């Protein structure tokens, strides 16, 4: 499960051999959500889902992550494709500045 981003205190991962739709797993402390990236009429929609065995992120945290995901959607998709379709390693990027 490669980490693709460290954004502020959020760790963002893509699990290898995972399933569609394109999604990322976001951790902060001992909490996690899954963020599905869906394109409806060429507009990105982000659907946050609770992951079993984990407490979810707060709504404020999800809003912060949504801003990041919208800003980095193309890079996230590129990393998804490299991991899922080409079995290529990706480097985790660290973003310390709030978007």
Predicted features along the sequence, with ranges:
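Residue-identity detector for glutamine
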Residues: 6, 29-32, 71, 88
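A short, structured beta-strand/loop element
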Residues: 15-16, 20-59
């Amino acid at each position: 499960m490669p980490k693709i981003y460290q954004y502020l205190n959020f760790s963002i991962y893509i699990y290898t051999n995972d399933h569609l739709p394109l999604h990322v797993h976001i951790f902060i402390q001992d909490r996690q959500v899954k963020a599905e990236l869906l394109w409806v009429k060429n507009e990105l929609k982000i659907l946050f889902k609770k992951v079993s065995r984990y407490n979810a992120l707060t709504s404020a945290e999800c809003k912060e992550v949504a801003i990041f995901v919208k800003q980095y959607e193309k890079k996230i998709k590129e990393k998804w494709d490299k991991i899922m379709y080409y079995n290529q390693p990706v480097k985790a990027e660290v973003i310390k500045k709030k978007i």
